[in-house]
Each structure stands twice: as C-alpha cells, then as structure tokens.
C-alpha cells in the first residue's frame, strides 16, 4: 500500500480539538458526523488518547442525531469500541472493516497486521452485540502471488461471514511499495476477470429508516 508512504507518520488532532470541530458542525445544522481518516483506529496515540476516548465524549454532545465511524482496521477495532457503540445514544451500528483477502498467506504478503481468525472474531463480536449492524468489507483481488486457491479461500471466507456489502478492488501497482518485489504478478486481465466474477451473496443492509434514525439503546431487563 502506498498510503503510508504518502502520509508519513500517523498523526491526528486531540480529543478537545475534535470536539470543538464537532460542536461547530452541530451549530451549523449537521445531522450526521462521520469520523474519518487514513487510519482512524490510530487516533490520539501522540496525545496519549484513544478513539474510544473520542467517541465517548462525542456521544455526550447535544444537538446531533447520529455519528458514523468510517473504515477502521480490524486490529484497531477493539471490543471496547464495539461494546460502546452497541449502547451509545448517537453512534450508528455501522462498521466498514477492510479485509483485503481471506487467505492468511496473502495477508502476510500484504504485511497486514491481522489474520482471518482475528477478522472473524471482530465480525462475530459486532453481531453478538448488534445483530442488526451493517458491516461493509474491502477486498483486493489480483495481489502478486495470489493463486486460484487463494482467491477461493477468500470467497469461502466471505460466504461464511455475516456482512452486508463488499467493496472489491483490483490490485494495481504503486511506486516504491514492497509489493513490486513480489514475483508471480497476476495479469491485469485475469485480475479484472476475477473482480467481475466474485460469486458472493451477502446479508442485505438494514432498511433506510433503521439505518439513518438514531440508534435505539436496548433497555435493561428488570
């Protein structure tokens, strides 16, 4: 991936500054705020803060209907974040979690900081806490060294996940990335053919009313 080369060292604002930006948006009439960034799960590390700290404070603000967390790496999506979202007042039960491949061999080649067992655990944790949650998944096909067997691993892995939608991308070369040194490059024509033929059925996303209205927090059993 070329993003780390382009962005440099991960950095972010602190909780206080982000809260002020949110307050300005709310004062301007915003109904929904999406938390986004190149690596949002890494928020606050330079300030000894965490993404959990931020979303807890944001949830306390008045005047906003809903928040949504954008793409977050599975190794940075903690059980604490999942648990908080499941009981929050304003955070939507919506997660977009990049997978990229359902093959541990390919994930290793991509230098991803997670494997399929962790990814599966995150999906199961979300669905256990929020059965109605909408979960999106990123997938890359045609990564150097990917074989038909690797691709089929991804297909079977996805078939077994309770997710709502897929973003499927065809691998393309980027200058100065380590992937350029990997042999067995998948021909672009083959990668495009695979991309257009991913035979996956996923769980339909929630209907618009439940997806855009403020979340309902389950009441505790007396």
List PLM regions with ranges.
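Canonical Radical SAM [4Fe-4S] cluster-binding loop centered on the CxxxCxxC motif
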Residues: 1-16
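S-adenosyl-L-methionine-dependent methyltransferase catalytic core, i.e., the SAM/SAH-binding region
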Residues: 21
